[in-house]
Swiss-Prot record:
Six disulfide bonds may be present. This is Gibberellin-regulated protein 1. One of its GO terms (biological process) is response to brassinosteroid. The gene is GASA1. Induction: By gibberellins. Down-regulated by abscisic acid (ABA). It comes from Arabidopsis thaliana (Mouse-ear cress). Coiled coil: none annotated. GO terms for cellular component: extracellular region; mitochondrion; plant-type cell wall. Keywords: Disulfide bond, Gibberellin signaling pathway, Secreted, Signal. It is found in: Secreted. Expressed in flower buds, style, stamen filaments, vasculature of sepals, flower abscission zone and green siliques. Lower levels seen in the root phloem, cotyledons and vasculature of rosette leaves. Residues 1-23 form the signal peptide.
Length: 98
């Protein structure tokens, strides 16, 4: 009888732990890439429309967009709307994203 109670208790604890791990995996998948992807091409066209060097701007913006899945609104600034976009830097420490 004591063995069966211990077995049932350990089985219930195992199921609880399994449920918690599964919920954590689902949450991390939602945060890390299964979110709705934005159209980087059109977002970067809007971002770079006033740039003096449009090809360079589109290339840098596209790279940043694919990594971060966001582009700040407007043609300049607004980095607070997309923290990942603002945090990417070149080897020299300058902002990578336009």
């Amino acid at each position: 009888m004591a063995i069966s109670k211990a077995l049932i208790a350990s089985l219930l604890i195992s199921l609880l732990v399994l449920q918690l791990v599964q919920a954590d995996v689902e949450n991390s998948q939602k945060k890390n890439g299964y979110a709705k992807k934005i159209d980087c091409g059109s977002a970067c066209v809007a971002r770079c429309r006033l740039s003096r060097r449009p090809r360079l701007c589109h290339r840098a913006c596209g790279t940043c967009c694919y990594r971060c899945n966001c582009v700040p609104p407007g043609t300049y600034g607004n980095y607070d709307k997309c923290q990942c976009y603002a945090s990417l830097t070149t080897h020299g420490g300058r902002r990578k994203c336009p």
